[in-house]
């Protein structure tokens, strides 16, 4: 499940190699659960996780959280351009996660 249609479109617009890897990893998450472990998923803080997508075109990150019933909600994505995750990108994911927790429609 996606936080918004816009986010789903952004993810589907990833370069082909990154998109293929993303789809493979999300398929594994649906089959085995959201915690695939490193190098695929990494817990960040208080229920926020990152899906680590690597391909020939670069590195993408997709932040996600889970809700009761094992529902996985993709919150935010970006193409990584530096070693460290930009605080702005992390803040967007945290803000959206708070909204998801408060809103029962997800």
PLM feature spans:
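Basic, Lys/Arg-enriched alpha-helical interface segments
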Residues: 1-59, 68-72, 81-106
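Hydrophobic/aromatic beta-strand elements that line small-molecule binding cavities or substrate pockets
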Residues: 62-63
């Amino acid at each position: 499940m996606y936080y918004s249609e816009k986010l789903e479109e952004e993810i589907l617009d990833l370069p082909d190699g990154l998109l293929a890897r993303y789809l493979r990893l999300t398929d594994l998450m649906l089959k085995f659960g959201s915690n695939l472990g490193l190098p695929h998923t990494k817990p960040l803080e208080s229920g926020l996780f990152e899906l680590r997508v690597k391909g020939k075109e670069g590195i993408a990150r997709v932040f996600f959280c889970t809700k009761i019933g094992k529902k996985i909600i993709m919150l935010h994505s970006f193409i990584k351009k530096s070693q460290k995750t930009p605080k702005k990108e992390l803040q967007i994911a945290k803000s959206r996660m708070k909204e998801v927790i408060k809103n029962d429609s997800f």
